[in-house]
């Protein structure tokens, strides 16, 4: 086996560079010296971030990524794009995560664009959302536009893409680290490409960058005979711990995790398996504790329309999907709020989600929340809690599968690492 020894900086590194250069020429000497300088600079930047994280102090400007929870003052965020959004092919994992009334839509339009007029309106809504975030003092970054209609093939499957609309699904920020999730839908296999420019920039400025093991998405990852004929079937299967994804290899969507300082809560869902959860648990230990919680939910996918933590010891808990472990939160002194019934009309298309996007809100800090302009009931709920509402209409953007929390990934919040669940 070929073994390669890294040259470290300092006097020994310089001597090694000189020795190699004398053997292989001046060009190589220059390359080695530049490599040493680059490595030393990157290490120094990385060490600054690591030291700041351990010291539990806010990351300074040198480290652009720093977020420990869902409510500290928001300074920088990635907001997704609806441009070029395509309907995913109607594969078994898509079928398991969507409502039967839309199956014909997927069968007919899989691989093609979502209705263009609808997407155009969604684009305009998200642009307005970005403008409002900027007015509130938040730095906004956007993923690159990509043609998602291009068909691709791996040794295990072929598919077209979907979109880069929901950064919450693919990116998870924990402290000064940004983690790319190994998502479970084949149509999302190459979604990371839209974010690479942004993440490389964060990395070059000192942030940690981790990519979880990429799943092959071979047929073995999915229960090809997953029975989903009715809502009753889904309830039984979820109660039995049976999902369309198997334990063949790790997979998870970042949106199945929600952060509260040292404690991170996750659900086993149609897109997040126990192998994926265990990978995260080992990766984040010992500084963070990963807790598995569950709900009475016939079709679990993404925790933030079921259980959305909006402040220290303050959580929105979906009354239609009660948490089986809710007493643990109450014993820990948390306040559990049941949000009101959503007001979204029955005839509004929701191709990938439920009406409970109303509770999928984005906290700008403990006293400011971005909420849908049409959802007057939940606005009143927040006002009664002493939280001012920033109202934005993203009704057409909702149709693509997300609310404010889904459409964003908070990159930097001004705060420190604390425990809220002791």
Curated annotation (Swiss-Prot):
It catalyses: L-arginine + glycine = guanidinoacetate + L-ornithine. Residues 1-37 form a transit peptide. It is an enzyme of class 2 (transferase). Coiled coil: none annotated. One of its GO terms (cellular component) is mitochondrial inner membrane. Pathway: Amine and polyamine biosynthesis; creatine biosynthesis; creatine from L-arginine and glycine: step 1/2. Its EC number is 2.1.4.1. GO terms for biological process: creatine biosynthetic process. It is found in: Mitochondrion inner membrane. Induction: Transiently induced by estrogen, with levels peaking an hour after hormone injection. The keyword Lipid metabolism does not apply. GO terms for molecular function: glycine amidinotransferase activity. The modification Phosphothreonine is found at residue 416. The keyword Mitochondrion applies. Keywords: Membrane, Mitochondrion, Mitochondrion inner membrane, Phosphoprotein, Transferase, Transit peptide. CDD domains: amidinotransferase_AGAT-like. Gene3D superfamilies: L-arginine/glycine Amidinotransferase, Chain A. The active site is at 253, 302, 406 (amidino-cysteine intermediate). Homodimer. Catalyzes the biosynthesis of guanidinoacetate, the immediate precursor of creatine. Creatine plays a vital role in energy metabolism in muscle tissues. May play a role in embryonic and central nervous system development. Belongs to the amidinotransferase family. This is Glycine amidinotransferase, mitochondrial. The lineage of its organism: Eukaryota, Metazoa, Chordata, Craniata, Vertebrata. The gene is GATM.
């Amino acid at each position: 086996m070929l073994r390669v020894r890294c040259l470290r900086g300092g006097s020994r590194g310089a001597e090694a560079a000189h020795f190699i250069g004398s053997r292989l020429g001046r060009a190589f000497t220059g390359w080695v010296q530049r490599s040493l300088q680059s490595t030393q600079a990157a290490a120094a930047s990385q060490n600054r971030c690591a030291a700041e994280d351990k010291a539990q102090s806010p990351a300074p400007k040198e480290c652009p990524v720093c977020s420990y929870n869902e409510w500290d003052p928001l300074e920088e965020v990635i907001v997704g794009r609806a441009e070029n959004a395509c309907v995913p092919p109607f594969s078994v994992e898509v079928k398991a995560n969507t409502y039967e009334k839309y199956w014909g839509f997927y069968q007919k339009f899989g691989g093609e664009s979502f209705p263009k007029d609808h997407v155009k309106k969604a684009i305009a809504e998200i642009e307005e959302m970005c403008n409002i975030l900027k007015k509130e003092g938040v730095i906004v970054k956007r993923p690159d536009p990509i043609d998602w209609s291009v068909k691709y093939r791996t040794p295990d499957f072929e598919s077209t893409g979907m979109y880069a609309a929901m950064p919450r699904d693919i990116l998870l920020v924990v402290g000064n680290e940004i983690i790319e999730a190994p998502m479970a839908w084949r149509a999302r296999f190459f979604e990371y490409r839209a974010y690479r420019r942004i993440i490389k920039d964060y990395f070059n400025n000192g942030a940690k960058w981790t990519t979880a093991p990429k799943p092959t998405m071979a047929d073995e990852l999915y229960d090809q005979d997953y029975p989903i004929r009715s809502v009753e079937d889904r309830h039984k299967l979820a109660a039995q711990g049976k999902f369309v994804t198997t334990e063949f290899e790790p997979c998870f969507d970042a949106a199945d995790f929600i952060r509260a300082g040292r404690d991170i809560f996750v659900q086993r869902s149609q897109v997040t398996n126990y192998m994926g959860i265990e990978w995260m648990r080992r990766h984040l230990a010992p500084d963070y504790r990963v807790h598995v919680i569950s709900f009475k939910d016939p079709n679990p996918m993404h925790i933030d329309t079921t259980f959305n933590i909006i402040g220290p010891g303050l959580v929105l808990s979906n009354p239609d999907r009660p948490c089986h472990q809710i007493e643990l939160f109450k014993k820990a002194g948390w306040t559990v709020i049941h949000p009101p019934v959503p007001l979204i009309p029955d005839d509004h298309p929701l191709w990938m989600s439920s009406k409970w996007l109303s509770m999928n809100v984005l906290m700008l800090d403990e006293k400011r929340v971005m909420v849908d302009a049409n959802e007057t009931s939940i606005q009143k709920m927040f006002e009664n809690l002493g939280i001012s509402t920033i109202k934005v209409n993203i009704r057409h953007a909702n149709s693509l599968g997300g609310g404010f929390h889904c459409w964003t990934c908070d990159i930097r919040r001004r705060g420190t690492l604390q425990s809220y669940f002791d």
